[in-house]
């Protein structure tokens, strides 16, 4: 016979051809022993089962093997029960057709949403004794006559297979069948009682009432009443509507359309009423994970940008169905043969987590004094050519009353500068590391194009202009290095930086202006060679530096000539009583070295040292009047205290004094490092709200398909003429295939949801374990050791569960790739056949005699050509 049934029957015969004991006569009793299912599976996937070991008499095992292999390996849900195949002498024809159609769709057009068995034409011709299907062989016509148009109606009048739901006891239609652990359910009955999500084998438990279930993943994370019970009530209202439509159709066929429309209207109204508020709220964080223990260190941000960008990154958009079959996964299939157990309740990510993370940087964490990364130096921006800049402002401060009073006054009046982030990335710098400063409140440079009051700095002092020729390392500095190195030492914990500089300034100014004998001969000789009005002005809290002129010079290289000191600089130097010296720079050097009394680069106890200049800074500074360079204040750099190298020129007494001012060091280098929590937000991360929304959309589509499928099944079993039955069968196969794709997508979303939760929980367990291991082992208690064992065991369980999900999804992807290759090969074969047919048509236009005459004429012309030449 022609039509979808005949085409499906012919396809089954071709697949089972040559297999022992398999004879496909119809789509009912021929499949009872299960060998036909196994033969189709073995034809396409011989690696899945051994067909030679099967016996025709073992009906139950054959069917069980075929159904389990198709469900676990191919993602085809089992619509049939092996017990029904044993108990019934003639299985239900519509059930067999529906199940075999999924084999057909899987092996011929996998991934195509609208795929269905081939239909001869849109309007099939009326049946005639001689009409046969193109795919049916000559001997198949008599066998196809057994499948009369009313065969489905006859089977519908017979006793249907055991289709009672194990949960509610009502009849289960084919489109509603859901087999789980050997029991038959309605799809809407096999749901979580609280969150109404489809259950996955191995991840649910019995509910409070008999026949109900509770999932171990979502219901514990959703608020009460968010999605509970609404789906069941909707289904209960839809079933009477379908029954009323069926009764009305039996009584009066003209009322069937109105009944279907009424049922659809009731379904739509129930969906609007019950599914509008189904957007679940953000899950709340479990109480035991809400806040870290009191003794746990606060996780440190890697960069400054990460501390401000606390919101999770926006995930990549992905399509709703990903071509209707990205991952083929059956809902009823377990996670790798049931290896996945109930995972612990994972820690959700959401708004509470962000608030918790935002509260951490408000206080100074303990690790800020332990390890500080060394920032790199940025080049100073090019200042404008007009305006005196901060340099003359600093000189006016000395002229009006000295830097000491201004510093003391600003310590109580000026606002505290912006905290400097030690993790900010800057350019690579050169130089030997100096003593670090673990101070988290150092201000970065704030260049300003207009005159502004000087920014308070942890290291403003007149002695910053001291030449660094005294240090033995700076005499060999190459001339190509334009960078300067400025590193203050640690400050006293109890004193503010400005108060320290004020006290130091008062101690470092001797009453006499005579140079100190500690002044080096090298610096005096170099300064005497450049004494012609090139005295370096008193430095404000920053070292003058131009982006165009390098700040490093060879000691013998003369400075820039023709530069004069600004009037403000002269007045400030004269008011300080230092104009009697040959050079203002010598006087500054003498005054500073007179107070220090040594060549040590270490500062006094409790004081912040002045940053060192390179050897070239003994020469005059760049021109101030012509270029007007802005002075740039640079915050002190930080380094790891465990990589500290003492200066070789530091005296033991100064070194001891500096140690007294350091903060308390950690007990051992192995403990106390900052613990950074691993981020788990990947590009493939899907927010929970999106997962919930897509699953709700899928459930609504499944409800609509099931409602249409119940009505269509009743029509098919009720009987119809051959033409309308063929059309209904095509619609039926398409409906089953669409439902199968939606179920696979829903199963994939459930696995993605579980995978993300397990990954988040693993990150939490790892961080808690690191915090525990970060504690010295001598301070461990019995409770800590027991907690370590529990965390290690939980970590191993989480890893195994994640591995099971990943392996399951990978197998689905590999299977889908193989199916895509098969489909591509089939398409290529069809294209090749079309090309061959077109070539044969083109060849038919030429007659053989004409071609032979044409070739003979060409040969004669070639043979005559040499004779003509001769």
UniProtKB/Swiss-Prot annotation:
One GO biological process this protein is involved in is: cell migration involved in sprouting angiogenesis
In residue numbers, the region (Mediates the interaction with RAB13 and RAB35 and intramolecular interaction with the CH domain) covers 659-870
Q: Indicate where the modification Phosphoserine is found in the sequence.
A: 291, 305, 480-481, 494, 496, 628, 747
Quote the Gene3D superfamilies the UniProt record gives: Calponin-like domain, Cysteine Rich Protein
**Stretches with biased composition (Basic and acidic residues):** 354-365
What protein name does the entry list? MICAL-like protein 1
Reading the lineage from the top rank, the first entry is: Eukaryota
Q: Where is this motif: NPF1?
A: 421-423
Function of the protein: Lipid-binding protein with higher affinity for phosphatidic acid, a lipid enriched in recycling endosome membranes. On endosome membranes, acts as a downstream effector of Rab proteins recruiting cytosolic proteins to regulate membrane tubulation. Involved in a late step of receptor-mediated endocytosis regulating for instance endocytosed-EGF receptor trafficking. Alternatively, regulates slow endocytic recycling of endocytosed proteins back to the plasma membrane. Also involved in cargo protein delivery to the plasma membrane. May indirectly play a role in neurite outgrowth.
């Amino acid at each position: 016979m022609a039509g979808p049934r005949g085409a499906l029957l012919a396809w089954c015969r071709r697949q089972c051809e040559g297999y022992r004991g398999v004879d496909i006569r119809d789509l009912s009793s021929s499949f009872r022993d299960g060998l036909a299912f196994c033969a189709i599976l073995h034809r396409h996937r011989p690696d899945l089962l051994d067909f030679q070991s099967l016996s025709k008499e073992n009906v139950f095992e054959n069917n069980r093997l075929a159904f389990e292999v198709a469900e676990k390996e191919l993602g085809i849900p089992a619509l049939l029960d092996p017990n029904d195949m044993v108990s019934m002498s003639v299985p239900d024809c519509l059930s067999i057709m529906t199940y075999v159609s999924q084999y057909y769709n899987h092996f011929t057009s996998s991934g195509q949403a609208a795929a269905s068995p081939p239909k001869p034409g849109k309007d099939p011709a009326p049946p005639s004794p001689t009409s046969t299907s193109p795919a049916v062989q000559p001997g198949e016509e008599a066998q196809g006559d057994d499948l009369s148009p009313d065969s489905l109606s006859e089977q519908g009048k017979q006793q249907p297979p055991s289709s009672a739901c194990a949960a509610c006891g009502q009849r289960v239609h084919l489109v509603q069948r859901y087999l789980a652990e050997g029991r038959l359910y309605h799809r809407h009955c096999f749901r979580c009682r609280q969150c109404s999500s489809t259950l996955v084998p191995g991840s649910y438990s019995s509910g409070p009432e008999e026949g109900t279930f509770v999932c171990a993943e979502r219901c514990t994370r959703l608020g009460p009443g968010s999605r509970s019970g609404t789906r069941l009530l909707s289904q209960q209202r839809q079933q009477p509507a379908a029954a009323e439509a069926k009764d009305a159709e039996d009584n009066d066929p003209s009322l069937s359309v109105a009944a279907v429309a009424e049922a659809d209207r009731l379904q739509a109204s129930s969906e609007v009423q019950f599914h509008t508020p189904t957007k679940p709220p953000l899950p709340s964080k479990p109480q035991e994970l809400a806040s870290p223990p009191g003794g746990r260190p606060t996780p440190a941000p890697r960069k400054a940008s990460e501390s401000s960008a606390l919101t999770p990154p926006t995930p990549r958009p992905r399509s709703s169905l990903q071509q209707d079959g990205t991952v083929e996964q059956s809902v009823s299939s377990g996670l790798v043969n049931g290896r996945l157990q109930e995972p612990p309740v994972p820690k959700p990510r959401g708004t509470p987590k962000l608030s918790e993370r935002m509260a951490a940087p408000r206080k100074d964490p303990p690790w800020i004094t332990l390890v500080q990364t060394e920032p790199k130096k940025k080049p100073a921006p090019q200042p404008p050519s007009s305006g005196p800049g901060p340099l003359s402002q600093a000189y006016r401060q000395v002229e009006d009353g000295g830097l000491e009073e201004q510093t003391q006054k600003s310590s109580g009046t000026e606002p505290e500068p912006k905290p400097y982030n030690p993790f900010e990335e800057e350019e690579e710098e050169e130089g030997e590391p100096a003593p670090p400063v673990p101070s988290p409140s150092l201000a970065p440079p704030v260049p300003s194009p207009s005159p502004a009051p000087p920014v308070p700095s942890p290291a403003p002092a007149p002695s910053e202009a001291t030449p660094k020729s005294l240090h033995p390392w700076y005499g060999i500095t190459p001339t190509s290095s334009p960078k300067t190195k400025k590193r203050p030492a640690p400050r006293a914990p109890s004193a503010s930086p400005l108060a320290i500089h004020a006290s130091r300034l008062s101690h470092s100014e001797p009453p006499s202006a005579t140079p100190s004998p500690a002044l080096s001969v090298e610096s005096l000789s170099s300064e005497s060679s450049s004494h012609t009005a090139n005295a370096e002005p008193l430095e404000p809290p920053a070292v003058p530096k131009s982006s165009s002129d390098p700040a490093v010079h060879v000691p013998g290289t003369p400075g820039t000539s023709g530069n004069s000191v600004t009037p403000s600089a002269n007045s400030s130097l004269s008011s300080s009583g230092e104009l009697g010296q040959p050079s203002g720079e010598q006087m500054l050097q003498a005054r500073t070295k007179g107070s220090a009394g040594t060549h040590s680069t270490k500062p006094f106890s409790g004081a912040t040292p002045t940053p060192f200049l390179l050897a070239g800074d003994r020469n005059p500074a760049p021109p101030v009047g012509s270029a007007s360079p802005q002075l740039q204040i640079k915050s002190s750099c930080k380094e790891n205290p465990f990589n500290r190298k003492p200066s070789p020129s530091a005296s033991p007494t100064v070194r001891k004094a500096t140690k007294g001012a350091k903060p308390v060091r950690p007990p051992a280098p192995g403990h106390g490092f900052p613990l950074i929590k691993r981020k788990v937000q990947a590009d493939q991360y899907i927010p929970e709200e999106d997962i919930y929304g897509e699953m709700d959309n899928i459930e609504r589509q499944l409800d609509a398909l099931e409602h249409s499928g119940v009505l269509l099944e009743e029509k098919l079993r009720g009987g119809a003429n051959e033409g309308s039955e063929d059309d209904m069968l095509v619609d039926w196969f398409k409906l089953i295939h669409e439902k199968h794709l939606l179920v696979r997508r829903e199963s994939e979303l459930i696995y993605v949801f579980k995978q993300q939760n397990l990954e988040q929980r693993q990150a939490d367990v790892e961080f808690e374990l690191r915090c525990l291991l970060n504690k010295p082992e001598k301070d461990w208690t019995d409770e800590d050791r027991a907690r370590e064992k529990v965390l290690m065991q939980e970590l191993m369980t989480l890893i195994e569960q994640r591995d099971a999900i990943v392996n399951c999804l990978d197998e689905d992807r590999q299977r889908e790739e193989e199916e895509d290759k098969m489909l591509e090969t089939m398409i290529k074969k069809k294209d090749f056949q079309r090309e061959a047919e077109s070539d044969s048509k083109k060849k038919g236009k030429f007659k053989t005699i004409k071609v032979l005459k044409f070739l003979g004429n060409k040969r004669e012309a070639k043979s005559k050509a040499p004779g003509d030449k001769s």
